[in-house]
Amino acid sequence: MALTDSLTYDTARVYGGSGVMQYYRDGAPTDLRTLASLMITDSDNTASLWLQELVGTGSYVNGVMERLGLRHTRVNSRAEGRRADWERYGWGQTTPREMTGLLVRMRNRELVDPASSDAMYRLLTHTYFTKYSLSELPPYVQVAAKQGMVNASRSELLLVNAPHGDYAYFIATKNNADTSWGYDNAAWVLQQAVARYLWAYFEPRSDWRPAPGAGRLLGGE
């Protein structure tokens, strides 16, 4: 398949939660690149499941992860033999080391081929979710990022193309006592604090700070 391949949306694919594709009208035209973009930038559940089906279910994705040497990164949803893991962990599971390593390999043009690595990396630099870790980084610094969130777990992967050199990290929480979805959720406050600390560590001469009122603009106080 090519990114430009045309597809037709069917409302039978609706999956609630995050994302805008669930609101498409029946029969709406789309394409593979739009699905990939929505999956990455908007964490679109409907688009993600459609893509998972197109590539050959979660079992195929897990085979790719195995070939990439990722022992712990797996899709549990709609994947043969993963039901117990799905009941325990949900859609998928990973580790900070494997997820960060995967993004670094993408940055270094080592996934699939250089052109594919670049295309994937570009998508990751256009996330919709800027009010978490990215709110503590200058908007003029490119960041490849992906967020994940369910009630009791919040995660965020970043590779920051900082002026004095790239740095990458992954932060994830589990069994959260605070399962709220407001701007001041404890896990998101932690993610912001980590982002702020790492920026100060790697760019100690930077005088950039979030602008007054930025929190209110993003839905905070």
Task: State where each predicted segment sits.
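Active-site-proximal beta-strand/loop segments in catalytic clefts of secreted hydrolases
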Residues: T11-A12, I40-S43, L51-V55, S77-R78, ...
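Short, well-structured active-site flanking segments
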Residues: M1-V14, G58, D113-S116
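Short linear capping/connector segments at secondary-structure termini
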Residues: A12, R78-D85, P139-Y140, A214
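Conserved catalytic neighborhood of penicillin-recognizing serine enzymes
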Residues: V14-W50, G58
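Structured C-terminal helix/loop/strand segments within mature extracytoplasmic catalytic/sensor domains
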Residues: L54, G58, G101-K131, Y140-Q142, ...
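Mid-domain, small-residue-enriched loop/turn segments at the edges of structured enzyme/sensor domains
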Residues: A28, A36, L49-L103, R107
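Extracytoplasmic
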Residues: A2-T4, M65, L70, Y89, ...
